[in-house]
UniProtKB/Swiss-Prot annotation:
SUPFAM superfamilies, alphabetized: Translational machinery components
Listed InterPro entries: Ribosomal_uS11 (IPR001971), Ribosomal_uS11_archaeal (IPR019961), Ribosomal_uS11_CS (IPR018102), Ribosomal_uS11_sf (IPR036967)
Organism encoding this protein: Thermoplasma volcanium (strain ATCC 51530 / DSM 4299 / JCM 9571 / NBRC 15438 / GSS1)
Family per similarity comment: Belongs to the universal ribosomal protein uS11 family.
NCBIfam families: arch_S11P, PRK09607.1
Keywords per UniProt: Ribonucleoprotein, Ribosomal protein, RNA-binding, rRNA-binding
Protein name from the UniProt record: Small ribosomal subunit protein uS11
Biological process per Gene Ontology, one example term: translation
Amino acid sequence: MEVNRMNKTGIAHIYASQNNTIIHVTDPTGAETIAMVSGGMVVKNDRDQASPYAAMKAADMVSETLKEHEITDLIIKVRAPGGNKSKIPGPGAQAAIRALSRAGLKIVRIEEVTPIPHDGTKKKGGKRGRRV
């Protein structure tokens, strides 16, 4: 007789800016936090928080917690600062996704959820922009 096991799914919210990478895993409703690790928690120097290495180590810590909670499937939502800031995810986003997949977690889908302004506030830099 075959045992039909239900795959447990989680949602990994990856916020990747130029200064830090935060990996936050919730249940499918988003109400309960299962694991949350940032780049600053795994490296010593502040300048390394956004590095791919820090994101990889953070993803490894998250995957350990997910194995304890018996979560096998992940929906990944990648977010950049957005708004009137950068709309491109930082260097840690790709490394975090790669580390999560290498840890043996099945990635169901990857979504881009960077907030896009619909003519919101003005970007900093003044009338003539940033002069380099």
